[in-house]
Amino acid sequence: MTEHDPLLKYREQHKQRLNYMPWLYWSLKPKHRAWAEQWQADYQAYLMDMETVTIGKNCFISPLAHIFAERGRPIEIGDHTFIAADCTLHGPLNIGREVAINHHCILDGGRV
C-alpha cells in the first residue's frame, strides 16, 4: 500500500469499522481478507513481542484495544476470539475459544 493506492482511504476506513465491529472480519470478501489478515498478523506479532501474550489461530485484535500483560501477568487468547476497540485487558487472563469482547470492556486479572 502506497499513498498512490486508490484503495488506501477505503482500507483505512474499513480498519476503523473492523476495530469497532470485529465480527465483520470473518465475513470479508477474499480480496479484502488478504490485506486484513496481513494487518492482523503484523499487529499480533508486535503485541506478542511487546507483552507476555499468546494468541490463538484466526483471532482479531483491534490495535485500538489496550493490552497489558507484563512479566508474570500473561494473557492467553484462544482461537477464533475477537477483541474490539477501546477494551482494556490486564493480565493474568485466560480468554477461551470463540470469545467476543466488544468495545469498551475492561478485564483485569486482579492480584497475582
Spell out what each predicted region is.
Residues 1-112:
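Domain-scale signature associated with acetyltransferase and cell-envelope carbohydrate enzymes
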